[in-house]
A protein has these predicted regions:
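N-terminal capping/small domains of soluble enzymes
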Residues: 1-97, 103
Length: 104
């Protein structure tokens, strides 16, 4: 099988393929390293990041339904300073684009 060019350009951002993670459930990807090679993704879309740390919603945050589950975490995040100091250096070690979900 020959190599197929799967590169895409989205609003001027060149990605090697259109595969990206869903914001929220993937965090910044640390927990998924043993399951997913981040180098193979077109981009990592990180969990929402706010200027200040945000504790999110009170429990319960998850409700099971017949067809799956619903969640309402409430954009819990450690804030921009933590993200810049910890998550950006982690993500930069991979050959993939970083899409930051800015909330607040």
């Amino acid at each position: 099988m020959s190599n197929i060019n799967t590169a895409v350009n989205i609003c001027g951002v060149e990605m090697k393929n259109p595969v990206t993670t869903a914001s929220g459930t993937f965090g910044s990807g640390r927990e998924f390293g043993e399951f997913v090679d981040l180098n193979r993704l077109g981009a990592v879309t990180v969990k929402g990041v706010a200027a200040e740390a945000w504790k999110g919603n009170n429990a319960p945050r998850i409700a099971e339904t017949y067809g799956g589950m619903l969640n309402s975490v409430g954009l819990q995040n450690p804030g921009a300073d933590y993200f810049i100091e910890n998550d950006i250096p982690f993500l930069r070690q991979f050959d993939t684009k970083i899409i930051v979900n800015i909330c607040g």
